[in-house]
Amino acid sequence: HVGVSANISRISTLDLKDKDRYMASENVFSVAKKMGFWDGKEPFKFWKAYSGGNYFGEPKAFSIREYFILNALAPSLKLSYDSEELPISVKPDKPVAVTDVMALLRQTYEGTEWDMTKNLKVAVKNKETKETDTITSPAANPWMGTDMLNMLNGVKEGTVTRNRLVAVPQCSYSHVIQLRNWLPDAVGGVAWLSFDNPGQSPRIPIFSGTTDLPAAFGICGQHRHREDAIVWKYRTANKLATVRWGLTKEKINGAVAHFEEKGLSEMPFVENRYKELQDSKGEETARAFLTGYTADFAGATILRWQEMADEFWKMFARGF
């Protein structure tokens, strides 16, 4: 089963007699009634009493993120966004691969009814055929800020509907944990770590046996710009790319795909090399190899994102 709870109350009814499946404070019902959150007559629903709805004010026990992911993994259930509740978890229609999870964390709902750029069209003329076509504006991107959204909707009401994306630019980091119990612990567990916007940044494999990480990983860059903070190794290129996302996204997406394929395709080598070193030189040397591999992989991604940042600055030299 797959469950999603993205900063929202998802729990519905409570059966505290079923101690194997439910646990709550003894006063969970009485406090709700005392505070006027529940009238004591209609069936008690935790999310309705203590939350009332999602962060857009809709009286639901879910938001677009929960709906989109659960529906993507179990389309046979025919879940509806118009529902008041969705299942806490669903059984996927087919096995979920680590790449499926990575792809879901990159979601901006492009090409769906939830796509925030769907109405931002411009007419372009083909230089060769002289025919005019309508495309999404190169200046449109799914991570537009409040000022831009207000301006667009001020020009024409309803141009852009704000939707909470899975991938957001204010993200500090995200990770996908892959566990494989048939391998030695040191290589069986892998954390695929990404910094900044998961819709634009690469994932770095960190194995369970890794004993140290590059110094930049330990420095926060969320509150100010810091060249020594890992998040800013990617954020500069990512932010610049949104200036004309229609022109830059292919390059960003290509780099993300390259490192995803690189990490996955090199895993058998890493696993075998770890075992060889463990047998010949001991556990400490084998773990040092894993540590070095992650550092080298991270370094390669950093270099590529720095190159793209330089390229984007040059691309926009005449103005944004």
Model features per residue range: what roles?
Residues 1-320:
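C-terminus-biased signal that marks the final domain/tail of proteins
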